Swiss-Prot record:
GO terms for biological process: translation. InterPro entries: Ribosomal_uL14, Ribosomal_uL14_arc, Ribosomal_uL14_CS, Ribosomal_uL14_sf. PROSITE patterns: RIBOSOMAL_L14 (PS00049). Part of the 50S ribosomal subunit. Forms a cluster with proteins L3 and L24e, part of which may contact the 16S rRNA in 2 intersubunit bridges. One of its GO terms (cellular component) is cytosolic large ribosomal subunit. PANTHER family: 50S/60S RIBOSOMAL PROTEIN L14/L23, LARGE RIBOSOMAL SUBUNIT PROTEIN UL14. CDD domains: Ribosomal_uL14. Keywords: Ribonucleoprotein, Ribosomal protein, RNA-binding, rRNA-binding. This is Large ribosomal subunit protein uL14. The lineage of its organism: Archaea, Methanobacteriati, Methanobacteriota, Stenosarchaea group, Methanomicrobia. Belongs to the universal ribosomal protein uL14 family. It comes from Methanospirillum hungatei JF-1 (strain ATCC 27890 / DSM 864 / NBRC 100397 / JF-1).
């Protein structure tokens, strides 16, 4: 997994409901835990762009509902600052469901994907229609 090269603000915490931007059958998911997070003294785990989380599917097809799956954050409302000085924010917080090898389970992604995510996860970048 490649490093991002920028410091992304961790704006999504556990318990947050996110939209699922792929065609796996999940529509709304809730963050349960953050992959690789080691906290300090009861600190709430947070995640940002291109981070992996374990999520619970709240709305979707009957075979996907109430399942725990892994997901990668591809959009976040909180603005990020690129080294060029550009500030980028999206309209919503969105994830893509991935498998254990961090490859997407769906076959298409709806909406734009941040360039930082496409660099870290090339398979997600190749499926995206718009990379911002």
């Amino acid at each position: 997994m490649k490093g991002l090269g920028i410091k992304v603000p961790r704006a999504v915490s556990t318990g947050t409901k996110l939209t699922c931007a792929d065609n796996t059958g999940a529509r709304v998911v809730q963050v349960v835990s953050v992959f690789g997070y080691h906290g300090v003294r009861r600190r709430q785990p947070k995640l940002g762009l291109a981070d992996i989380a374990t999520v619970s599917v709240k709305k979707g097809t009957p075979d996907m509902r109430r399942k725990l799956v892994r997901a990668v954050v591809i959009r976040q409302k909180k603005e990020i600052r690129r080294p060029s000085g550009l500030r980028l924010s999206f309209e919503d917080n969105a994830v893509v469901v991935v498998d254990d090898k961090n490859e997407p389970r769906g076959t298409e992604i709806k909406g734009p994907v941040a360039r930082e995510v496409a660099i870290r996860y090339p398979r997600i970048g190749s499926m995206a229609t718009i990379i911002v």
